[in-house]
Design a protein with these regions (language model features):
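Positively charged n-region of N-terminal signal peptides that target proteins for export
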Residues: 1-4
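C-terminal motif of bacterial Sec signal peptides marking the signal peptidase cleavage site
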Residues: 14-17
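Bacterial signal peptide processing site
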Residues: 19-21
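Structural detector for short beta-strands of small beta-barrel domains
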Residues: 23-42, 113-132
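Short, basic/aromatic beta-hairpin or loop at an interaction surface
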Residues: 46-57, 136-148
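N-terminal post-signal-peptidase region of extra-cytosolic proteins
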Residues: 57-67, 149-158
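Flexible glycine-rich surface loops and low-complexity tracts that mediate binding to linear polymers
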Residues: 74-85, 165-177
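OB-fold/S1-family single-stranded nucleic acid-binding modules
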Residues: 90-108, 180-199
């Protein structure tokens, strides 16, 4: 009887120790060969796109995967650890992902939906706005209900702004590398919808 009680105690202790360390899960992910674009906390940002084995669509991972060196043009299969953070940083994910194993790396082009490369219509005011001594475009997005003019801090490829004219642009997005391992969102004019001289 005593031996049975001791065995029960040891088993309970072992299970308790396992539960105490059971603050993470192990998953297998497919990582797309291209980065997508998604809404971050303040603006659009490049994101990894991943699928679990039972997923049918890609989803965005904002914080990246610790220990994983992404190279565009390859589709990856990874085994990763997802750890729930007890006290996550403000404005950050409550889950931290880290690489356990690189299962495969295959050169290919993943089939990414166009929704991960958003296009939008932008209106540009005839006069720029000054902010800490620098001039910026003043823009708004009435098609999505953003009717107040706001400062625009990003370059728009293919747009030659001429002060004194108001513009309506169709703008597209893409991901470009700016340094080894670093990427940013590039904005480009898809179509000049309207250009009018400012009203007196």
């Amino acid at each position: 009887m005593r031996k049975y009680i001791i065995l029960l105690f040891i088993s309970a202790f072992a299970l308790g120790a396992c539960d105490k360390n059971d603050d993470y899960t192990v998953r297998e992910w497919t990582v797309a060969s291209q980065l997508g674009i998604s809404h971050g906390f303040h603006t659009l940002q490049p994101v990894l796109l991943v699928k679990a084995n039972d997923d049918t669509s890609w989803r965005a991972v904002y914080e990246g995967i610790e220990g994983f060196d992404y190279e565009p043009g390859y589709e990856y299969k990874l085994r990763i650890k997802a750890k729930q953070l007890a006290e996550p940083p403000q404005d950050a994910s409550s889950v931290r992902y880290s690489l356990l194993e690189l299962i495969s790396k295959i050169p290919t082009r993943s089939n990414i939906p166009d929704s991960y490369y958003p296009t939008f219509t932008m209106e540009v005011a005839p006069e720029p706005v000054s902010y800490y001594g620098e001039l910026y475009l003043s823009v708004r997005f009435p098609e999505v209900g953003l009717n107040d003019w706001q400062r625009w801090s990003f370059r728009i490829e293919g747009f030659d702004y001429e002060q004194g004219y108001s513009y309506k642009l169709k703008v597209g997005t893409s991901v470009v590398g700016v340094d080894e391992g670093y990427y940013t969102v590039q904005y480009s004019v898809l179509e000049m919808l309207d250009k009018q001289p400012a009203q007196e």
